[in-house]
From Swiss-Prot:
Residues that coordinate or bind Zn(2+): C75, C91, C98
Cofactors named for this entry: Mg(2+); Zn(2+)
Gene: hisI
Subunit structure comment from the entry: Homodimer.
Metabolic or biological pathway, per its Swiss-Prot or TrEMBL entry: Amino-acid biosynthesis; L-histidine biosynthesis; L-histidine from 5-phospho-alpha-D-ribose 1-diphosphate: step 3/9
Descriptive protein name: Phosphoribosyl-AMP cyclohydrolase
EC number: 3.5.4.19
Binding locations of Mg(2+): D74, D76, D78
Homology family: Belongs to the PRA-CH family.
Class of this enzyme: hydrolase
Origin superkingdom: Bacteria
Amino acid sequence: MLEPDFVKGNGLIPAIVQDCITGEVLMLAYMNRESWLKTRESGKATYWSRSRNSLWIKGETSGHYQIIKEILIDCDADAIVLKVQQTGAACHTGYRSCFYRKIVGESFEIIGEKLVDPEEVYK
């Protein structure tokens, strides 16, 4: 099976996640070889949580799964783009995308759509 070069990034590669229809950037996460293999095997995005130091199946707690539709790999084979069918919010804050804020001068402007209350989703 083809796979990214996990050596360059000390075992991790960045995974940029995009909506497969709109092209909207939903999030950035990291994958190790184990999460890569699980993702390829299951068809659901699985990442490596750097804070918890464990595998993380996107949507396992919230129900907001990311179904893989296409995978792109960069020229150095050390970063990927996952084109996904997003169910619900991609961001743990309840927004559709983790990139829901725009920098305007010295402040943030909310430009994204909040889909859920995280207090209700992550009980």
